[in-house]
């Protein structure tokens, strides 16, 4: 008991952050949204776990993404879900609405849990570097930012990549600080980097970025003797980090044990064949295109982040650059954050496949600059104390809550008030993922004799598992003798689709 009390005393701030992050994401977690890719990821999780437990390790090379981290999380979630189902309900049909939502909850819950674990460790580092007040502002900024909130509640890889990349750089920076070199934090950075690379190929940026990080940390005065010592430190520490990272990648992806060449070939195809060449359909500024161009991500930053984050992060970047030239004072972590944002956006802009969620890994770094600006501003007015910071954090939370509570749990519908919210944003770049399905399936299920209705929807539709009746694809209309009782169409595209099918 004494050990627990001491542990809580030492880490109570991190413990509170951990639970706030998780609890805020729990309401309707298994009932709100089946994201567009969720059925595919559920299938991939099944393939991965089946291959893993049958000893068919080559079969764990399921997709080019490669999504290995998500499939590990999903595999564990399925086991826990099955255990609880047996204890609470006995045998349950996972294709039934209740069975599906139960499993869906556990799959997403363990994603949220993983995010919270790595974010909490990162907050520990921030607290050691900048103090409690800075960390509190950062936590509130990031945790309740609508775009990050939305993607941290779905069965997908982007929030994982975001948190793991940021955590990896924080752990490595903290572990390599002069007088504080800690191999434990370097190894933890390697683990986070490996899990990020195993999630999505855009995480490969972590390799050159970590080298750059070490250069920023170790390079000091520019004389021959110190340069030689610094470069030795960089080479030794980078090789250590690099080898540990590759070891984690190898250990956590069984396909590499038995068919490394094919596995790496498939991974590379995901970069060159899909990411660079394939593109993705958009209605960008009212024009249909597969590549919205170089301005896509800067405009996405403006229309998808909250005004508070946009203004404060922009001011923070300006303040940082001003400080560098005016006072020759450089915060190395902020310098690295600026490098990351610039190189990541440059890398992603060079590919033809562009999506709003691909900007997600930059959010923690923008939040860092926003927090920096607020902390400097409060210091200037001599109000950098707990009551004032708590008040500012409360304002940020209240602002974000007011922006999203009307659309709960459809956080994906958030667009900045700079452009008039969703009504303005959808004409610039409409969200690629649907929302509002919960309201729709609740309405359909509430209709009289819902179980006997013949329902037609254009597939793929993502609320089918929650329906109490049988639904058909509209292409099957001519094949059924019974006429449809209800047709659910997504929009103008579906009317055009039906006209083509007569």
Q: Model-found features: residue ranges?
A:
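Transmembrane-helix motifs of polytopic, lipid-linked glycan transferases
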Residues: 14, 19, 97, 101, ...
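Short helix- or helix-capping micro-motifs
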Residues: 17-22, 138-143, 150, 170, ...
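Transmembrane-lumen/periplasm boundary regions of multi-pass, lipid-linked membrane glycan transferases
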Residues: 24, 46-47, 66-73, 207-334, ...
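Extracytosolic helix-loop segments that constitute the early lumenal/periplasmic catalytic or substrate-binding loops
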Residues: 24-27, 39-72, 76-95, 274-283
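Catalytic lumenal/periplasmic loop and adjoining terminal transmembrane helix
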Residues: 26-31, 254-257, 263-266, 270-271, ...
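Membrane-interface transmembrane helices that cradle and orient dolichyl/undecaprenyl
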Residues: 128-130, 168-186, 220, 326
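Short hydrophobic alpha-helices at membrane interfaces in multi-pass membrane enzymes
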Residues: 136, 174-194, 231, 340-341
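Hydrophobic/aromatic-rich transmembrane helices and adjacent perimembrane loops
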Residues: 151, 158-162, 196, 205, ...
């Amino acid at each position: 008991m004494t050990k627990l009390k001491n542990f809580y005393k030492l880490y109570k701030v991190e413990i509170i952050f951990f639970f706030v992050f998780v609890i805020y994401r729990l309401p309707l977690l298994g009932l709100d949204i089946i994201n567009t890719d969720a059925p595919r990821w559920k299938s991939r999780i099944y393939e991965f776990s089946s291959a893993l437990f049958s000893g068919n390790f080559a079969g764990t090379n399921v997709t080019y993404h490669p999504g290995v981290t998500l499939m590990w999380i999903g595999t564990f979630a399925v086991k826990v879900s099955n255990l609880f189902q047996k204890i609470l309900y006995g045998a349950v049909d996972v294709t039934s609405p209740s069975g599906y939502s139960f499993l869906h909850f556990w799959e997403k819950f363990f994603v949220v849990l993983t995010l919270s674990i790595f974010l909490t460790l990162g907050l520990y580092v921030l607290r050691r570097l900048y103090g409690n007040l800075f960390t509190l502002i950062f936590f509130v900024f990031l945790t309740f930012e609508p775009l990050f909130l939305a993607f941290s509640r779905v069965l997908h890889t982007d929030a994982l990549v975001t948190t793991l990349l940021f955590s990896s750089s924080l752990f490595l920076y903290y572990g390599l600080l002069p007088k504080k070199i800690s191999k434990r934090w370097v190894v933890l950075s390697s683990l986070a980097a490996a899990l990020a690379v195993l999630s999505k190929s855009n995480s490969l940026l972590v390799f050159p970025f970590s080298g750059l990080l070490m250069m920023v940390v170790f390079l000091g005065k520019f004389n021959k003797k110190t340069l030689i010592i610094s470069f030795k430190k960089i080479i030794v520490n980078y090789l250590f980090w690099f080898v540990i990272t590759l070891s984690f990648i190898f250990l956590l992806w069984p396909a590499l044990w038995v068919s490394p060449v094919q596995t790496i070939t498939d991974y590379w195809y995901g970069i060159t064949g899909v990411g660079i060449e394939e593109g993705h359909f958009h209605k960008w500024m009212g024009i249909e295109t597969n590549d919205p161009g170089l301005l896509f991500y800067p405009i996405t930053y403006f229309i998808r982040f909250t005004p508070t984050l946009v203004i404060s992060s922009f001011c923070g970047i300006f303040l940082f650059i001003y400080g560098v030239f005016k006072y020759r004072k450089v915060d190395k972590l902020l310098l690295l954050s600026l490098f990351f944002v610039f190189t990541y956006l440059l890398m992603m802009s060079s590919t033809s496949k562009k999506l709003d969620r691909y900007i997600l890994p930059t959010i923690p770094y923008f939040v860092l600059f926003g927090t920096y600006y607020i902390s400097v501003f409060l210091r200037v007015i001599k109000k950098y104390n707990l009551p004032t910071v708590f008040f500012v954090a409360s304002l940020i939370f209240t602002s974000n809550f007011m922006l999203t509570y009307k659309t709960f749990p459809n956080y994906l519908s958030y667009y900045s008030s700079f452009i008039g919210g969703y009504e303005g944003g959808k004409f610039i770049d409409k969200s690629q993922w649907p929302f509002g399905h919960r309201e729709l399936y609740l309405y359909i299920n509430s209709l009289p004799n819902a179980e006997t209705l013949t329902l037609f929807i254009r597939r793929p539709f993502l609320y089918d598992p929650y329906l109490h009746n049988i639904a058909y694809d509209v292409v099957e209309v001519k094949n059924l003798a019974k006429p449809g009782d209800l047709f659910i169409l997504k929009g103008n595209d579906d009317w055009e689709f039906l006209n083509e099918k007569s």
